[in-house]
């Protein structure tokens, strides 16, 4: 069960160049305690990749990761925070 101040989020990461992959992986390894799931798909027709992450953490932690990803050259990141329908009692 989630603690009160923790959220679940999904981040979509569009990686436009192979040179950007190392920076993305290095950054994600620093936030590995937040990652619940990861899936990567190559888009060869665009010479790019799409990574989706399922995360659990505080709003500050999740926002910091998303912001840092978006500052990497050749990387676009979008975050979606999920709302719990049944909050803990």
Please annotate each region the language model reported.
Residues 1-89:
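Long, contiguous binding/interaction regions
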């Amino acid at each position: 069960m989630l603690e009160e101040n923790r959220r679940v989020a999904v981040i979509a990461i569009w990686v436009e160049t192979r040179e950007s992959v190392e920076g993305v992986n290095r950054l994600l390894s620093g936030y590995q305690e937040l990652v619940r799931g990861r899936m990567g798909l190559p888009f060869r027709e665009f010479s790019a990749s799409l990574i989706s992450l399922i995360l659990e953490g505080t709003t500050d932690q999740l926002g910091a990761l998303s912001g840092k990803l978006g500052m990497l050259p050749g990387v676009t990141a979008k975050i979606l925070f999920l709302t719990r329908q049944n909050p803990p009692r």
